[in-house]
Amino acid sequence: MSRRRAHDTEDEGYDHRRNKRRRVSENQEIEDRLESLILRVGERSTSSVESNLEGLVSVLEADLGTFRLKILRILSDCAVRMPEKCTVYTTLVGLLNAKNYKFGGEFVDHMVKTFKESLKLCRWDAARYSLRFLADLVNCHVISATSLLQLLDTMIDVSNEDTVPQVRRDWFVFAVLSTLPWVGRDLYEKKESALESLLLRIEVYLNKRSKKHHNALRVWSSDAPHPQEEYLDCLWAQIRKLRQDNWAEKHIPRPYLVFDSILCEALQHNLPQIIPPPHHDAFEYPMPWVVYRMFDYTDCPDGPNLPGAHSIERFLIEEHLHHIIETHHYERKDCAAQLLNFPFKHKIPLEYCIVEVIFAELFHMPTPRYLDICYGSILIELCKLQPGTLPQVLAQATEILFMRIDSMNTSCFDRFVNWFSYHLSNFKFTWSWDEWDSCLLLEAEHPRPKFIQEVLQKCLRLSYHQRITEMMPTTYAKLIPLTPVPNYKYANEEAANLPGTTVAHQLVVAIRQKCTPEEVVNILKEIPSSGYSGEEMSDGSFNALKIDVFVQTLLNLGSKSFSHSFAAISKFHAVFRALAETEEAQICILHNIFELWSSHQQMMVVLIDKLLKLQIVDCSAVATWIFSKEMTGEFTKMYLWEILHLTIKKMNKHVIKLNTELSDAKDKLSKADSSSSDSDEDTPHKRKKPITHADKPSEEVVERMEEKLEAANVNQKRLFLIVFQRFIMILSEHLLRSDTDGRDPDTDWYRWTIGRLQQVFLMHHEQVQKYSSTLETLLFTSDLDTHILEVFQQFVALRA
């Protein structure tokens, strides 16, 4: 009998567990269905948005009792992650609030919490979208206009804070201004005087703020034909135009207007007092930017008009397109399809808007959000999806860029070169070059012939020399790159007269016979220590002829491909290290690479990158070599600056890596100490898994890591000091010589060089910022020429 009872109990327990699993499974299915319904509401379907909303409200109202928290979370997530559907979700919340006032209050509290968390965690876009959502809830009679105005006023209070960065004050003003298109009309009708007071406070702030950073962020130095407006100035002009139009805009869909009779009966909630978190030194705010303009209505053919530069519709369209790129940039095909599927495409010249926004992203200063190739690949997909119109618009844009290239920012010039060469490589290198042949009459350093020359160099990397030669008209012969072959001087006709030729030939035979590094060292010993005709460095630290013979011979033998060169360097790594003991010796190695491969820019880039990775040459040696007299003829060529930037990036990555490792080690040490101190107090059931001895770093290890990081920081600072000091020297010398000779200093060479200085500041702004006070003290002093000093001051203003 007892056995029977036990069996019955087992069956009951099994049934209970099975039913519980079934309930959990059913609940999960319902939650997934609710999430799917909420996410897809308002998307294109057979029924209208309004009927979709009505049906969804009925479903959600029935499930509020069981799935309240889930629904709250999904809706607040949608508010932040799908800002393009803001008004759809605010209408949904408004209808739910009209039926269930308690739920409406809970949602407002949840949204306020999301907003405050976003501010606290420096999630600035999420905070702005949350604020927009709260503002649009005023239109749906969920939140009172008075309490929203109090929040907006509190945010504008930040503009009066002292001793905080301007970028902080700017962001809070921008967040308020960018919210007004959604709620401005309602505030104008209900609280006109309070709205005007808010706008007056904003105007006062905008009139007194510094715009020292503006010139550093411009794509073009000229304002013709389109002004290069600072982002807050542009948005303020758009808001003023909207105010002149009595806050009536034509872009934002407002489904809540259909339900006005229902929504106006609902009780409203008041927002609690929200105080923005105070500034902290660790906070990073969005940097300012310049609004990019390429087209106006005169550039577009017959069809819908392009909204004016100061119409709020232009801001709303551009923001929406930027968000589509942000959401889909990992999938170029999806991104292109979504851009072409823009909801209001029949009201605007969509292709022009898309092309302008993509180039705005590509030319964004100080750096684009994504890799250059991301934008190039999206444009290619757009051309494939819309072959009838988009290639023509893109060709028109390219023509505009080329004609305005004289005043283009140097960083943007590089990006334009990289994009155009990549684009040509995907369309059989076809272009109407004859239309640009007027540039052949200009000086070689002028941006137009320089652009074509650099494009052809990049095309060479994506094709081969004969193909480049065949695709270009004969008139462009002087701009076509040289055939990329090594210039091995020990095989030339004059080689017999060169010191080291005999040893070079011995080395060729030995390497082909697969000799060891030790055998190479023995062969090089035959070169006398006096080197070139008795010439030697004053400190006797290296033998230039040994380096010359070894580097040129080895790399010439490995010239068949990158892989052959890499294999040669790796095999004789020890010989390189022995020869490159000093910075002067490393510079000598770099000079020999240039002498051998001066006609093959890409080979130089990849070889120097390899030498840096193998720590054969130091970053400081590369920087010094770039500014050496031997490289004067190459100074305005893109590849040289590509080498400098990859060198700086390598140093930056090294510092970041050491910083991360030290931080992790300190965390482990701290956790191990706290774990051991807590272990005696914890009961056996509460005791956590202890950190093992193997996981715990010793204090000595941490100290060594700190020393490594300190040394890396010193090297990084030294690298930047070398680069900026050399810039100051050559620019100051040019300005002084021009003044002495009575010549205009504003030459093409000067513009390229000052542009490269600015590029180093902006491309590596996060790292350079750490040393700004040192740079100001040692290099960028008040007695420096104002042209050079302004570049530094503009850089500092970016984070001021």
From Swiss-Prot:
Annotated compartments: Nucleus
Annotated region described as Disordered, given as residue ranges: 1-26, 669-699
SUPFAM superfamilies attached to this UniProt entry: ARM repeat
Pfam entry (one): MIF4G
Chain ranges of the MIF4G domain: 31-243
InterPro entries, A to Z: ARM-type_fold (IPR016024), CBP80 (IPR027159), MIF4G-like_typ-1 (IPR015172), MIF4G-like_typ-2 (IPR015174), MIF4G-like_typ-3 (IPR003890)
Major location (coarse): nucleus
SMART domains: MIF4G (SM00543)
Example GO molecular function: RNA cap binding
Gene Ontology CC terms, in alphabetical order: nuclear cap binding complex; nucleus; postsynaptic cytosol; presynaptic cytosol
UniProtKB keywords: mRNA capping, mRNA processing, mRNA splicing, Nucleus, Phosphoprotein, RNA-mediated gene silencing
Residue positions where Phosphothreonine is found in the record: T9
GO BP term, example: nuclear-transcribed mRNA catabolic process, nonsense-mediated decay
Record note on quaternary structure: Component of the nuclear cap-binding complex (CBC), a heterodimer composed of Cbp80 and Cbp20 that interacts with m7GpppG-capped RNA.
Role: Component of the cap-binding complex (CBC), which binds cotranscriptionally to the 5'-cap of pre-mRNAs and is involved in various processes such as pre-mRNA splicing and RNA-mediated gene silencing (RNAi). The CBC complex is involved in miRNA-mediated RNA interference via its interaction with Ars2 and is required for primary microRNAs (miRNAs) processing. Also involved in innate immunity via the short interfering RNAs (siRNAs) processing machinery by restricting the viral RNA production.
Annotated family: Belongs to the NCBP1 family.
Name this polypeptide is given: Nuclear cap-binding protein subunit 1
Native source organism of the sequence: Drosophila willistoni
Record gene name: Cbp80
